[in-house]
Amino acid sequence: ISRYRGQFTQGWDRLREETFRRQKALGVIPADARLTARHEGIKAWDDLGSEEQIVASRMMEVFSGFLSHTDTQVGRIVDVLQALDLFDNTLFIYLVGDNGGEGAAGNEGSTNYLGALQGMQEPIGRQLKQLDDIGGPNSFALYPAGWAWATNAPFPWVKQVASHLGGTRTPMVVSWPQRIHDQGGLRSQFSHVNDITPTILDAVGLALPEMVNGVRQLPLDGASLLPS
C-alpha cells in the first residue's frame, strides 16, 4: 500500500482523464475516441470535503495495493512455469474481475461494506478514525463509486449499471508464446467469459463430452477465441 501513498490526491475526475490519455497513447482505444461525461449521480471530486478526500484517497491506495499484490502472485505462477520450461507452451489467461469497477458503496465509500449494504453507512468522522485499518484484517472497505467510474474509462457508469460498458467490460491478458507471436498485441473481437472453456478445449484438441457418468451434457455457451 505504501508505494501508492499520495498517488490519488488529484481525485477521480483527473485520474479518469489521465487514464483516457494513456489509453489513446497505447492504442487501446481509437485516437478519435471521446471521453464520456461523469453522470450527475457520481459526485465531482472537488465537491467532497477535505476529510472525505482523505478517506477516499486512502481507499484507492489500498485498492491499488491489492492489484499489485494480485499481479505479484500471478507472477509467481509465471516464474514456476518458466523454471519448469513450460511457460512458452502454456495458454495463460489472466482475467481479473467479473464486471466493471464496483460502485456499490455509493459516493461515500465504506469501511464496513456489509454494514453499508444494510443501510448503516458510517459517518465520515468514523471512517477517518479507521483510516489506518483500511486494508487490514479489521476492515472490509469498498472505495467510493467515483473511483469505479474513473477506472472504467472511457466507458460510462459502474458494475451496478450493466446496460453500459462501464458495468461489464474487464481487461484480459492472454499469453501463449509458441502460438501468439505479436507480444503486446491488441484484439478487438468481442469475447465473453463463456468463451474461456471452449478456448481451452480447442487449444488442447478436445471435444466437450456428450455424456459424463451417464448424464447427458448440455452444450456450452461461448466459442473458441483461438481464431482471434
Language-model features, listed with the residues they occupy:
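Long, well-ordered, tryptophan-enriched scaffold segments
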Residues: 2, 13-48
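Substrate-binding rim/cap in mid-to-C-terminal beta-strand-loop elements of soluble/periplasmic
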Residues: 3-7, 25, 50, 79, ...
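A long, amphipathic alpha-helix that forms part
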Residues: 5-22, 52-90, 101-103, 107-148
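Long, internal low-complexity/basic segments
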Residues: 35-38, 48-56, 106, 196
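Short glycine/proline-rich turn/loop motifs
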Residues: 42-59, 175-181
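Beta-sheet entry/capping signal
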Residues: 88-94, 172
